[in-house]
Amino acid sequence: MMNGENMDKQTVIGFVVLFCVLELVFYLKKLYQSMALTLAVFGIFSLLFFLLYIPVLSKKAVPYVINYFKPPHQRVREIKVGSDETTDNSIIRLKEKAKTLHPDEGNRISGRSSNSFKDSASCIITIVDDSN
């Protein structure tokens, strides 16, 4: 039996061989429009294959593409606290969210300085951009 990694390699090799054979047949019969269509279709499927099956890209590129097609008020972006993208409005919203999540820790949250979120540069917070 073959494991999944070999099957993926066999799938890629099979698609490449099928693509080359189709391109050669269309070239010999002088069907240039069919060559272009085949190239476009295989190009799209190859791009989807690489986006979905390469682990590095599937963690970064696919969520970025999905987030790109969402409406602006539903887009999620990660910003490092303390960076230039952090605004006072986002800090206020974060404090309000923290109060609703942990109501028993209200004294500790209100006792912090107003720039405490900007001072800690090591944490990453996901913020929904609803400014539009």
Swiss-Prot record:
UniProt superkingdom: Archaea
GO CC annotations on file: plasma membrane
Principal subcellular localization: membrane
Spans traversing the lipid bilayer: 12-32, 37-57
Keywords per UniProt: Cell membrane, Membrane, Transmembrane, Transmembrane helix
Localisation per UniProt entry: Cell membrane
Membrane topology: Multi-pass membrane protein
Identification of the protein by name: Uncharacterized protein MJ0332.1
Organism: Methanocaldococcus jannaschii (strain ATCC 43067 / DSM 2661 / JAL-1 / JCM 10045 / NBRC 100440) (Methanococcus jannaschii)
Classification of source organism: Archaea, Methanobacteriati, Methanobacteriota, Methanomada group, Methanococci
